[in-house]
């Protein structure tokens, strides 16, 4: 790799970003590229999964953490409080009456803005190369897998009412500082 080269790496998905931050980006940076581009074949994972994959703690997701950071940077933390209050108001409703209140926190920002913040958060201090993380879009995911619409951890559109209950509980746990599963 020459110092004028861009280095592209493909990842199947980026959930927490820990491995990227703690090792992969550092290893790639030692090759001295001008830029490191990490392409995720999955969209940003924003919501917990409650149908088989153990991704129940929303505070572990880098897309969520990037969005929280953007809300703080733009002095819009009130959106977190409003979403929390909506979740709490629905907490004892039958799950069929619940809605995904966590979607509200993502509304102020574009996918590109969140991706840029993820890149910033996952770039280790002392990295020489520019780091850019690019995610698959939801529309392109649907085009590539037209017969499989299992996209709830990207969109928050759960296929059952229990999904809304889980996402709201995961957010309540996050705001209340409870490091426990939402189900």
Predicted regions and their residues:
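PRPP-associated nucleotide enzymes
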Residues: 1-183
